[in-house]
Regions:
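Extracellular serine-dependent O-acyl
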Residues: 150, 299-310
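Amphipathic alpha-helical segments in well-structured domains
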Residues: 64-67, 173-177, 240, 280-287, ...
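Active-site clefts of carbohydrate-active enzymes
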Residues: 12, 46, 159-170, 221-232, ...
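Aromatic-rich peripheral "rim/lid" segments of glycoside hydrolase catalytic domains that contact
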Residues: 105-118, 305-389
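Generic structural signal for well-ordered alpha-helical scaffold segments
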Residues: 143-144, 244, 291
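Hydrophobic, well-ordered secondary-structure elements that form the walls
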Residues: 294, 302, 345
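Active-site mouth of glycoside hydrolases
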Residues: 1-215, 250, 311-314
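Glycoside hydrolase catalytic-domain groove-lining segments
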Residues: 171-271, 300
Length: 389
């Protein structure tokens, strides 16, 4: 990582979360070529759990072949890849294999979809026991399948996994992370990180960056002003840098910001599905404000959520049927045209900015979590004062 990395989170526009069952390598190849043309370095993509591991002791061979073909196309376009495993939570839905469900645990905040239908059950305790052993089996299998593949930057253990289930303790979360990271490294000779998100800092979900990231070469974080109650606006340019610095303070690791972005407003609207949004020009200005802040303050890189809007024909299917704002986060519109945010990333890529030094800690982890919920807005207010001009 000699320079600040730029990337995009990726599901194809035509299939979204159905990519592995409606697989179109030609579409993926075209998208990767366009990413490379914009100067992006990394594509973060997602392995829908039930598509890859239909049973706890079985991995789908055809899915593995498709996975390797995606890695090969990334490498052909000189992109690095961050494959995200055990997905898991995505766009307001928990997509889960039937064998992971706990019939004594009902789904709560997020819908569970398993086998293409909504289930009333939530996931069992995947941080330990049989479910952890099944994940370790998958990690060893896929690691061996892609051992030392030149495209892989790092494995990602999961996307905002505390949205699936909160661990019983920070120690349990750290054990889960350490076991999977170990298995992935032993089988693939490639390190792993994990998709933490702003809610892991906004409430006590029994996740501590200091322990869960101990085995990672660097931490990753996701954050959105539109989903952050302490933000001053939907385009507050300090929210993402603040979450980055807070994660670095607690983990004592370098941090890559692997998700930031904004839902795009329909014409003439200021809300979409009741959530704040930005128009195209505002979204581009937001990216132009955040990218240099992250780079100057020592982040390893920044990935936009997400590469493309989805085909409007998917609007009646999950997750978009209940979360229509998720249709329009893209660097590209559904017709393939570029939004201003794509140009913002391309311009930043041409500057080839180097990595800056990581900043000193801005808060103490133990004091911060003990002081929640008040500590978050308090620390953010001090952070804004320090970076006011």
């Amino acid at each position: 990582m000699a320079r600040f990395l730029l990337g995009a989170n990726y599901w194809p526009r035509s299939s979204a979360m159905s990519v592995w069952s409606r697989f179109d390598l030609g579409e993926i190849d075209e998208d990767f070529a366009r990413m490379a043309g914009l100067g992006l370095d990394v594509v973060r993509f997602f392995l829908l759990w039930e598509a890859f591991q239909p049973q706890p002791d079985a991995v789908d061979a055809s899915a593995l072949e498709r996975f390797v073909s995606v890695l090969d196309r990334a490498h052909a376009h000189k992109l690095r890849a961050m494959p995200t495993l055990f997905c898991g939570h995505m766009s307001g839905v928990n997509w889960l294999p039937a064998w992971t469900l706990d019939r004594s645990s009902h789904s709560q905040r997020f819908r569970t979809i398993s086998g293409g239908v909504v289930s009333r059950y939530g996931i069992g305790d995947f941080y330990r026991g049989d479910l952890l052993e099944a994940q370790r089996f998958f990690a060893r299998t896929i690691g061996a399948c892609a051992r030392e593949h030149a495209a892989i930057l790092a494995w990602d253990l999961g996307n905002e996994f505390s949205n699936l289930r909160v661990p019983r303790s920070p120690a349990e979360a750290a054990h889960w992370s350490g076991a999977l990271t170990h298995d992935l490294f032993e089988s693939s000779n490639i390190g792993a990180t994990g998709g933490l998100h702003g809610e892991d800092l906004g409430e006590d979900r029994h996740i501590r960056p200091s322990s869960i990231a101990e085995s990672w070469p660097y931490a990753t974080m996701h954050g959105y002003p539109a989903y952050s109650p302490f933000a001053r606006s939907a385009d507050d340019p300090e929210v993402v840098p603040f979450l980055y610095e807070l994660t670095g303070s607690f983990s004592r690791k370098r941090v890559l910001f692997s998700e930031f972005g904004t839902p795009v407003c329909p014409p003439g609207a200021r809300l979409v599905a009741g959530k704040p949004c930005l128009d195209d020009e505002e979204g581009g200005a937001y990216a132009r404000a955040v990218l240099p802040r992250l780079q100057a303050r020592g982040a390893l890189g920044a990935f936009w959520w997400c590469w493309t809007d989805y085909d409007p024909a998917l609007a009646s299917a999950p997750p978009f049927d209940e979360a229509p704002h998720e249709l329009r986060f893209g660097m590209l519109r559904a017709d393939g045209s570029e939004r201003p945010v794509a140009r913002a990333f391309a311009e930043f890529a041409r500057e080839r900015r180097p990595l800056a030094d990581a900043p000193p800690p801005i808060a103490d982890e133990a004091e911060y979590y003990a002081g929640l919920p008040a500590s978050l807005p308090q620390v953010y207010a001090k952070y804004r004062e320090r970076h006011s001009f």
